[in-house]
């Protein structure tokens, strides 16, 4: 071999290894007492911290994460937003890709770090997300994104600075929090016959407080029009900002069960007890990266819909669910449970301390929360700046509302992918109508009219290894099957089931692939095909610039009006993927379905280490 050829081979090998290094991580999951909001309870720690540590990789890395379960209960870890191409056994979903990790046991997840962007990891065993197993993931892209940043600024120095800032973001894991564990919380609903969803705090990076501003203040903080449109006249929230637990507008029905609100433990719905604790502080340097800072925000909420703003600071939203979007400038944004946002902010205000506001903006509860953004060197400055959001998540002025991102409003939620990426037009190869709602009780949920997805569905015989296990059984109603290389439309109908005509929003997440939302409208879906609906209601569809995400809000039906959404995706990732609501109470109640994508190209060469006995 000539020296020149040898040199070329060495260079090629070095280049390949620079993008395909093996990264090994270890996560030790423990169950310990903590007090993230100043009030003690038991929770999940990851490597001795809560939330778990951010995991930072480069696009294309071969990742190996060993998870040790040192708790007395089962666990799995799902890598939310990662496509798991050619590694469906590492998705972390019990009953689909693996058996749960038993106490004292370990499991090694192996996958490619893909796609680039900001994602997160979390537990997927029952409702244990409520207990604190979650953390941020950042996959740095191979290529720079000059074309993305040039939409924000044409200045070459700004473009370089934004690229650097995006590769080293601040991480904000925003979660809701209750004084009760997930098992205790679920027991409240089954004992009382009511869906209970009152919280104590919202945390930023595991830090927060319990605020008790008083019932009169909270009543004034209700979203304008909410009580008038959705609840009986005179409805009042409690001193925790919660609606009465037994309201028909909240619980639906009538159901053939006995409602026992007296079995809801004290201090869940009312009886606020304040606790002073520590709020998160993010220190930023206006002299670094030409004054640009990027923030990776994870909505690790289990119930709440999180709003976000920083006093006096505008920001550019440039990434949703790990997918780059054509940037738009806002002063506040609302995130649904399960979503990730990445924002770019110019530190161009008077150096000082500014309040970050992260209230619940949904209709479930009036609940505020705060953190701080501090310009480096001004930690002792007085707080300053204009507030864009109130304690209850309401815009503080009409111009704030005009410049805010609301996922339930299609005119503001028009965040098209960058670079351009649109679905195939015309008729899909497959269509599946899924009817979402409650059946039989306020806390029992379905995605296909009647079947409830059990939390232990196929735990012993995961569908990756036994894809035909449900054939010929009633459980097959919990499974959809698609063919590889096909275009699929998922039609979601909400608020049509008996007793569930005032349905709250659902935050629908699909594992294994992102989907385009190509249509949205009110009423009952009574079309023979999506193609027919497009012809009759072209104003309700967008196949040119639809958003592309893995988590979508279905919207909120006020006054009992039915509505539907259409999501389209391409099947190129064979495997068993869960499609479910990311509100933990809804998933625990049955709102999930298994989609076996590419059954005609099912993974056959499963690594020996993942094969079941």
From Swiss-Prot:
<keyword id="KW-0479">Metal-binding</keyword>
<comment type="similarity">
    <text>Belongs to the multicopper oxidase family.</text>
</comment>
<dbReference type="Pfam" id="PF07731">
    <property type="entry name" value="Cu-oxidase_2"/>
</dbReference>
<dbReference type="GO" id="GO:0016491">
    <property type="term" value="F:oxidoreductase activity"/>
</dbReference>
<keyword id="KW-0325">Glycoprotein</keyword>
<comment type="function">
    <text>Laccase; part of the Pks1 gene cluster that mediates the biosynthesis of an anthraquinone derivative pigment that contributes to conidial pigmentation that provides protection from UV radiation, heat and cold stress. The polyketide synthase Pks1 produces 1-acetyl-2,4,6,8-tetrahydroxy-9,10-anthraquinone though condensation of acetyl-CoA with malonyl-CoA. The dehydratase EthD and the laccase Mlac1 further convert the anthraquinone derivative into the final conidial pigment.</text>
</comment>
<feature type="binding site">
    <location>
        <position position="511"/>
    </location>
    <ligand>
        <name>Cu cation 3</name>
    </ligand>
</feature>
<feature type="binding site">
    <location>
        <position position="506"/>
    </location>
    <ligand>
        <name>Cu cation 4</name>
    </ligand>
</feature>
<feature type="binding site">
    <location>
        <position position="509"/>
    </location>
    <ligand>
        <name>Cu cation 4</name>
    </ligand>
</feature>
<feature type="binding site">
    <location>
        <position position="80"/>
    </location>
    <ligand>
        <name>Cu cation 2</name>
    </ligand>
</feature>
<keyword id="KW-0560">Oxidoreductase</keyword>
<feature type="binding site">
    <location>
        <position position="509"/>
    </location>
    <ligand>
        <name>Cu cation 1</name>
    </ligand>
</feature>
<feature type="glycosylation site" description="N-linked (GlcNAc...) asparagine">
    <location>
        <position position="256"/>
    </location>
</feature>
<feature type="glycosylation site" description="N-linked (GlcNAc...) asparagine">
    <location>
        <position position="279"/>
    </location>
</feature>
<dbReference type="InterPro" id="IPR011706">
    <property type="entry name" value="Cu-oxidase_C"/>
</dbReference>
<dbReference type="GO" id="GO:0009986">
    <property type="term" value="C:cell surface"/>
</dbReference>
<feature type="glycosylation site" description="N-linked (GlcNAc...) asparagine">
    <location>
        <position position="74"/>
    </location>
</feature>
<dbReference type="InterPro" id="IPR001117">
    <property type="entry name" value="Cu-oxidase_2nd"/>
</dbReference>
<comment type="pathway">
    <text>Pigment biosynthesis.</text>
</comment>
<feature type="binding site">
    <location>
        <position position="580"/>
    </location>
    <ligand>
        <name>Cu cation 3</name>
    </ligand>
</feature>
<feature type="binding site">
    <location>
        <position position="586"/>
    </location>
    <ligand>
        <name>Cu cation 4</name>
    </ligand>
</feature>
<dbReference type="Pfam" id="PF07732">
    <property type="entry name" value="Cu-oxidase_3"/>
</dbReference>
<feature type="glycosylation site" description="N-linked (GlcNAc...) asparagine">
    <location>
        <position position="526"/>
    </location>
</feature>
<dbReference type="InterPro" id="IPR033138">
    <property type="entry name" value="Cu_oxidase_CS"/>
</dbReference>
<feature type="binding site">
    <location>
        <position position="122"/>
    </location>
    <ligand>
        <name>Cu cation 2</name>
    </ligand>
</feature>
<dbReference type="InterPro" id="IPR008972">
    <property type="entry name" value="Cupredoxin"/>
</dbReference>
<feature type="binding site">
    <location>
        <position position="124"/>
    </location>
    <ligand>
        <name>Cu cation 3</name>
    </ligand>
</feature>
<feature type="signal peptide">
    <location>
        <begin position="1"/>
        <end position="20"/>
    </location>
</feature>
<feature type="domain" description="Plastocyanin-like 2">
    <location>
        <begin position="171"/>
        <end position="359"/>
    </location>
</feature>
<dbReference type="InterPro" id="IPR002355">
    <property type="entry name" value="Cu_oxidase_Cu_BS"/>
</dbReference>
<feature type="binding site">
    <location>
        <position position="581"/>
    </location>
    <ligand>
        <name>Cu cation 4</name>
    </ligand>
</feature>
<feature type="binding site">
    <location>
        <position position="582"/>
    </location>
    <ligand>
        <name>Cu cation 2</name>
    </ligand>
</feature>
<dbReference type="Pfam" id="PF00394">
    <property type="entry name" value="Cu-oxidase"/>
</dbReference>
<protein>
    <recommendedName>
        <fullName>Laccase 1</fullName>
        <ecNumber>1.10.3.-</ecNumber>
    </recommendedName>
</protein>
<feature type="domain" description="Plastocyanin-like 1">
    <location>
        <begin position="29"/>
        <end position="142"/>
    </location>
</feature>
<keyword id="KW-0186">Copper</keyword>
<feature type="glycosylation site" description="N-linked (GlcNAc...) asparagine">
    <location>
        <position position="484"/>
    </location>
</feature>
<keyword id="KW-0732">Signal</keyword>
<keyword id="KW-0677">Repeat</keyword>
<dbReference type="InterPro" id="IPR045087">
    <property type="entry name" value="Cu-oxidase_fam"/>
</dbReference>
<feature type="binding site">
    <location>
        <position position="78"/>
    </location>
    <ligand>
        <name>Cu cation 1</name>
    </ligand>
</feature>
<dbReference type="InterPro" id="IPR011707">
    <property type="entry name" value="Cu-oxidase-like_N"/>
</dbReference>
């Amino acid at each position: 071999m000539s020296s020149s050829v040898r040199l070329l081979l060495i260079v090629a090998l070095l280049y390949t290894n620079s993008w395909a290094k093996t990264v090994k991580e270890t996560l030790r999951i423990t169950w310990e007492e903590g007090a993230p909001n100043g009030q003690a309870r038991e929770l999940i720690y990851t490597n001795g911290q809560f939330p778990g540590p951010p995991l930072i990789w480069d696009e294309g890395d071969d990742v190996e994460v060993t998870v040790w379960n040192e708790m007395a209960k089962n666990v799995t870890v799902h890598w939310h937003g990662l496509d798991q191409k050619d590694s469906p056994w590492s998705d972390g979903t019990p009953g689909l890709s693996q058996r749960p990790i038993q106490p004292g046991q370990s499991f090694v997840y192996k996958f490619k770090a893909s796609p680039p962007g900001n994602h997160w990891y979390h537990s997927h065993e029952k409702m244990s997300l409520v207990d604190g197993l979650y953390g941020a993931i950042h996959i740095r892209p191979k290529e720079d994104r000059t074309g993305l940043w040039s939409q924000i600024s044409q200045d070459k120095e700004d473009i370089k600075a934004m690229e650097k800032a995006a590769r080293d973001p601040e991480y904000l894991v925003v979660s809701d929090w209750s004084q009760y564990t997930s098992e205790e919380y679920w027991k409240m609903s089954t004992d009382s016959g009511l869906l209970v969803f009152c919280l104590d705090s919202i945390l930023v990076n595991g830090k927060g407080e319990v605020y008790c501003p008083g019932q009169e203040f909270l009543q004034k903080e209700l979203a304008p029009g909410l009580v008038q449109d959705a609840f009986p006249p005179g409805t009042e929230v409690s001193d925790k900002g919660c609606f009465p637990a037994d309201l028909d507008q909240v619980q639906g029905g009538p159901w053939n069960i006995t409602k026992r609100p007296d079995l809801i433990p004290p201090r869940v719905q009312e009886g606020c007890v304040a606790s002073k604790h520590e709020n998160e502080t993010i220190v930023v340097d206006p002299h670094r990266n030409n004054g640009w800072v990027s923030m990776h925000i994870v909505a690790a909420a289990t119930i709440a819909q999180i709003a976000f703003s920083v006093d006096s600071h505008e920001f550019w939203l440039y990434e949703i669910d790990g997918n780059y979007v054509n940037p738009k400038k806002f002063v506040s944004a609302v995130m649904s449970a399960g979503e990730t946002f990445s924002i770019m902010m110019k530190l161009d205000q008077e150096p000082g301390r500014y309040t970050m506001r992260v209230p619940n903006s949904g209709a479930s509860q009036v609940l505020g929360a705060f953190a701080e953004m501090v310009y480096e060197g001004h930690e002792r400055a007085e707080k300053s700046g204009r507030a864009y959001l109130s304690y209850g998540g309401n815009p503080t002025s009409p111009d704030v509302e005009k410049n805010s991102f609301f996922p339930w409003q299609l005119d503001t939620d028009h965040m098209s992918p960058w670079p351009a990426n649109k679905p195939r037009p015309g008729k899909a190869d497959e269509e599946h109508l899924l009817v979402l709602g409650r059946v039989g009780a306020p806390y029992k949920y379905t995605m296909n009219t009647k079947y409830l997805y059990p939390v232990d569905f196929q735990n012993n015989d995961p569908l990756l290894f036994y894809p035909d296990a449900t054939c010929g059984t009633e459980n097959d109603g919990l499974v959809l099957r698609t063919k590889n290389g096909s275009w699929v439309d998922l039609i979601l109908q909400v608020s049509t089931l008996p007793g569930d005509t005032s349905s709250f929003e659902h935050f629908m997440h699909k594992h294994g692939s992102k989907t385009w939302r190509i249509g949205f409208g009110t009423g009952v879906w009574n079309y023979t095909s999506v193609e027919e609906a497009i012809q009759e209601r072209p104003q309700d569809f967008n196949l040119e610039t639809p958003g592309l995400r893995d988590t979508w809000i279905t919207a909120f039906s006020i006054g009992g009006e039915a509505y539907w959404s259409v999501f389209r995706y391409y099947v190129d990732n064979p495997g068993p993927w869960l499609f479910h609501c990311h509100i933990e109470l809804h998933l625990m109640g049955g709102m999930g379905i298994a989609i076996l994508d590419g059954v005609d190209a099912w993974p056959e060469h499963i690594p020996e280490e993942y094969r079941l006995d």
